[in-house]
């Protein structure tokens, strides 16, 4: 179980997440740092309860999560072949990045000109440069910071493109011995889909409050735990940008 605060130009949304053997349950508990109204709370619980009442909806959710995880894994697996790396010294791990106080190896990366992406998923790597921070002792990726230095097409340019200047950051931290979790994900991209529809992704999500729970919970059991978690704690977050909802 963990908490995520996602911030976009429209404001912030706080969720409590719980991963189950069926799918990940995420319950909204605050907008712009303010707890939900009774009406919003009932609507949010009803949104999740539809997965409990409709097995087909839950199956689709699980399939989408699996597809997203596979896409991410393909990108990670491609990194050693897609990039050329150069030693850029060391940094010290801090809160949210690696293990606090422990050294991290910094490597700059740029595209490998001989790399041929096997699918449109990996195409974005051909126009990206940046750096990674590695825990060389535990063989863990603590951070990756990448920027598109040129426009990059995906689907070989047929499906669309991402504009030059797109930027992303992912931080990982050790939350307990040999257990690492993503602590921050920041995305800033613009482009076009099918050369017609504008694409704009601007978001930062911070994750905290990691607690270990049973991995054998059902989605229905997770929903009940999330309701209790929401009731037991008062959300105390800096107010985000006002948003119309």
Segments from the language model and where they lie:
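Structured extracytoplasmic
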Residues: 1-129, 137-142, 147-166, 174-176, ...
